Structures are given as C-alpha cells and as structure tokens.
Amino acid sequence: ATFSEAPPGDPKAGEKIFKTKCAZCHTVZKGAGHKQGPNLHGLFGRQSGTTAGYSYSTGNKNKAVNWGZZTLYEYLLNPKKYIPGTKMVFPGLKKPZZRADLISYLKQATSQE
C-alpha cells in the first residue's frame, strides 16, 4: 500500500505516537540535539544519512533516499527491511492510520522555525 491510499493523517494522534514510540530516541525541534537517533528537524526533502553531527550506519548513508510522505510511509512499516543495516531498533508501525498520523505530525513538527 502507498501513502496515497492511506487514511488522512491526524497530527494530534501522530504527536501521541511520536511521544510514546519515537521521542525516546528522536527530537524534532530546530536546534535540538541528537539522542540515540538523529534530530528530525527539516526531515522532509532531506536525503537519508545526511544530518550534520550524527553518526549514521553505512546502510542509511548508502540508501540515499529522499524523505517524504511515500518514503516515510514505506520505511515506517518495517525500517530494517527498508534500510538493511539501519541502527534504528524500532520494529515499525503496521497500521496504515498510525503511519499516516505520525507522518502528518512530523510534517508540522519538523518544519517549525
């Protein structure tokens, strides 16, 4: 399934998902530091493995995917399958609505100045 077939995302629900499943390892605010995972500010349109100051796996650097709705939708289903060798231990979100909600939240949260 593709992002275009996903239900419309709810950023409020996506924020809850981020706080419970992602915030332990990621930040979204501009200028916030890296944690176990990289800061996600400016994520949309950025190439994987290119955030300054974060040490990525070779798999992430070599994948060279441009992050957007479609690529995140596929990645968040099964990160280790999408980018073999990724350091991200998160198993993924199987429910299409959860992925759509999270992407909707990330679009807002990672673009705020």
UniProtKB/Swiss-Prot annotation:
Molecular function per GO: electron transfer activity; heme binding; metal ion binding
Modified after translation how? Answer: Binds 1 heme c group covalently per subunit.
Keyword hit for Heme? yes
Q: Where in the cell is it found?
A: Mitochondrion intermembrane space
In this chain, where does the modification N6,N6,N6-trimethyllysine occur?
Answer: 80, 94
Give binding positions for heme c: 22, 25-26, 88
Top-level division of the source organism's lineage: Eukaryota
Acetylation as a keyword?
yes
What is stated as this protein's family in its record? Belongs to the cytochrome c family.
Miscellaneous comment in the UniProt entry for this protein: There is one amide at position 24 or 29, probably one at 69 or 70, and one at 97 or 98.
Name used for this protein in its record: Cytochrome c
